[in-house]
């Protein structure tokens, strides 16, 4: 395998997103930001996320070969062996948990493990090929990253981290179902029961809209409960309204174009919420 293929195995963009999620959990409860702690937390989360990604590559190599988007992945092409992948995944997870425990505490390490367990065992192995609820349950993997970040600072302040974890949990279906509409033919070809394959694009678009309504409501809870201030509340309300606008258009037009726009819009929405948490707490 080439160096580039090893990097692809790690799914670095997802790893970075998980790290940013943990940093947000850290920032939500910290009274001041320790750059060294943030660096160590980032590294631990990247290691844990990368471990889950490698396992996903190994387990899904058969269906990856059937989908245009994933057919060139290293495990799908045979560039890497399952034994190599499993070994790398174990090493990365052990390293991530060891770092989390040494730099912070066992609670951070536990949440790191639980996030990986949900993604690997519950989503990848159990639900992905069996039921359309796969991505709903799998969304809990990101929620554990928020809790890990919070536990790195204080293991007693749980209300705000739990609400933010709920936001992450609700964000995942709205984000991923848009992608699933875009890639419905791929999933159908591979026999993966993503929601658009099961109920069609139109009903999926309605599900996205309904889910986002709940998501935006949940995102306003930190402001409504007085856990965060007006800066966060304003950002959550405006960005939520914009995302809902994209969802409404998707309900009217379920073309690949608007599915792609909805998928793309969900990313800056979450990033803006992350920034707003930090802005409200530390700036």
Curated annotation (Swiss-Prot):
Any one biological process term the GO annotation gives: heme O biosynthetic process
Associated pathway: Porphyrin-containing compound metabolism; heme O biosynthesis; heme O from protoheme: step 1/1
Membrane-protein topology: Multi-pass membrane protein
Catalytic activity of the protein: heme b + (2E,6E)-farnesyl diphosphate + H2O = Fe(II)-heme o + diphosphate
One function term, GO molecular function aspect: protoheme IX farnesyltransferase activity
Gene Ontology terms: cellular component: plasma membrane
Record's subcellular location: Cell inner membrane
Pfam families tied to this protein: UbiA
Superkingdom: Bacteria
EC id: 2.5.1.141
Transmembrane segments: 14-34, 35-55, 84-104, 107-127, 133-153, 163-183, 208-228, 231-251, 258-278
Alphabetical list of PROSITE patterns matching this protein: UBIA
Gene3D superfamilies in the cross-refs: UbiA prenyltransferase (1.10.357.140)
Family the UniProt entry places it in: Belongs to the UbiA prenyltransferase family. Protoheme IX farnesyltransferase subfamily.
HAMAP family: CyoE_CtaB (MF_00154)
Function field: Converts heme B (protoheme IX) to heme O by substitution of the vinyl group on carbon 2 of heme B porphyrin ring with a hydroxyethyl farnesyl side group.
Note: Carbon 2 of the heme B porphyrin ring is defined according to the Fischer nomenclature.
Record protein name field: Protoheme IX farnesyltransferase 1
Organism: Paramagnetospirillum magneticum (strain ATCC 700264 / AMB-1)
